[in-house]
């Protein structure tokens, strides 16, 4: 379980100094219908003949690398950058901090 705080003081390239940054998890955008590969694939698929390209079924990884999106909180900067961290099964953003000697409650 990886727990990351919602704010982080780190270097901002635009401000050229350390600033507080808002942390969110990166999400992939929707695929464009007009990308060259998608247009070619759709053209090939149309008409008779069934599936024309192999469907990938041999997945090797069980997790994805977590990518953090850091946004500078300076009102007239707001520059954004990505920061990749290691692979993990469970990722949490701004969860409760772990305390020493605390009894686990269920």
From Swiss-Prot:
GO biological process entries: chordate embryonic development; regulation of cell cycle; translation
Alphabetical list of Pfam families matching this protein: Ribosomal_L44
Molecular function, one GO term: structural constituent of ribosome
Coiled-coil portions: none
GO CC aspect terms: cytosolic large ribosomal subunit
Entry keywords, A to Z: Cytoplasm, Ribonucleoprotein, Ribosomal protein
Compartment(s): Cytoplasm
Region (Disordered): 26-53
Domain of life: Eukaryota
InterPro entries: Ribosomal_eL44, Ribosomal_LSU_eL42, Ribosomal_zn-bd
Chief location category: cytoplasm
Entry's family note: Belongs to the eukaryotic ribosomal protein eL42 family.
Function: Component of the large ribosomal subunit. The ribosome is a large ribonucleoprotein complex responsible for the synthesis of proteins in the cell.
PANTHER family: 60S RIBOSOMAL PROTEIN L36A/L44 (PTHR10369)
Subunit field text: Component of the large ribosomal subunit.
Protein name per the record: Large ribosomal subunit protein eL42
Organism for this UniProt entry: Danio rerio (Zebrafish)
High-level lineage: Eukaryota, Metazoa, Chordata, Craniata, Vertebrata
């Amino acid at each position: 379980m990886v727990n990351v705080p919602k704010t982080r003081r780190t270097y901002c390239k635009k401000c050229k100094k350390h600033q507080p940054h808002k942390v969110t998890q990166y999400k992939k955008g929707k695929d464009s219908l007009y990308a060259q590969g998608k247009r070619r694939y759709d053209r090939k698929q149309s008409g008779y003949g069934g599936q024309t390209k192999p469907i990938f079924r041999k997945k090797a990884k069980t997790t994805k690398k977590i990518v953090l999106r850091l946004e500078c909180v300076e009102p007239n900067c707001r520059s954004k950058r990505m920061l990749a961290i290691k692979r993990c099964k469970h990722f949490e953003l701004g969860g409760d901090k772990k305390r020493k000697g605390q009894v686990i409650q269920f």
